[in-house]
């Protein structure tokens, strides 16, 4: 089974060195939450596989100097139009693999910035989605985020009019809303599981498999204005 934990935000200028600090904090915390997703001995730092736009993958250590150099390289690439990003993966025990891609530091008025973590695991495995979303949201200070999967996204598209091509905002089994979005959320939609940095709120919406509850929460949050897309052209990081 593959799950996604992802966050999005609008323009926020940051240097590759500043982004490296966020990446380091995230990558150093992931082994405690997903120990099965690497072959590294317990307690040892992971070495990640870095995927490039062209050419073979390379190894990347999650220390700040190497991360800053990799982000600077991407920032300076002729193929990069805004910000700097990385695409990393790690494989571990049988059936476990994670990939994480992200781009930040940009000032585009039309393309949101994002971090997307994908976790492939055995069907019966427990994945700490709430802890993962809380970690990523706390580090990256996004506008919104969610824990979801392809089936949920397809259902929202078919039954509730969700369309990612129109920059629609969605929520899955878990949702993260920045402060202004959280203030618009109607009472009774999910449980405020945790308040994070910047007054953002992590919402526990439904257990795995309860698609009806997710569709209902999505519609209620959307109709209340809590899932309003950032205006285009974007002039701020969060709603």
PLM feature spans:
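C-terminal interaction module
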Residues: 1-46, 150-239
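Internal, hydrophobic cores of structured domains that mediate oligomerization or house catalytic pockets
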Residues: 33, 37-152
């Amino acid at each position: 089974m593959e799950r996604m934990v992802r966050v999005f935000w609008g323009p926020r200028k940051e240097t590759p060195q500043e982004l490296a600090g966020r990446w380091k904090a995230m990558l150093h915390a992931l082994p405690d939450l997903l120990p099965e997703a690497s072959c590294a001995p317990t307690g040892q730092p992971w070495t990640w596989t870095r995927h490039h736009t062209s050419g073979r993958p390379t190894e990347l250590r999650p220390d700040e100097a190497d991360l800053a150099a990799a982000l600077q390289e991407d920032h300076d690439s002729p193929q990069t139009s805004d910000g700097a990003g990385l695409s990393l993966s790690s494989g571990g025990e049988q059936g476990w693999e994670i990939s994480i891609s992200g781009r930040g530091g940009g000032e585009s008025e039309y393309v949101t910035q994002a971090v997307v973590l994908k976790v492939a695991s055995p069907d019966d495995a427990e994945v700490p989605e709430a802890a993962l979303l809380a970690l990523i949201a706390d580090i990256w200070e996004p506008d919104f985020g969610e824990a979801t999967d392809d089936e949920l996204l397809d259902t929202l598209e078919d039954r509730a009019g969700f369309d990612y091509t129109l920059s629609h905002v969605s929520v899955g089994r878990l949702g993260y809303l920045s402060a202004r979005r959280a203030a618009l959320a109607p009472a009774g939609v999910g449980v405020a599981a945790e308040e994070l940095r910047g007054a953002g709120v992590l919402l526990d919406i439904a257990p795995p498999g309860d698609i009806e509850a997710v569709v209902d929460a999505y519609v209620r949050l959307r109709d209340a204005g809590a899932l309003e897309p950032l205006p285009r052209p974007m002039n701020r990081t969060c709603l």
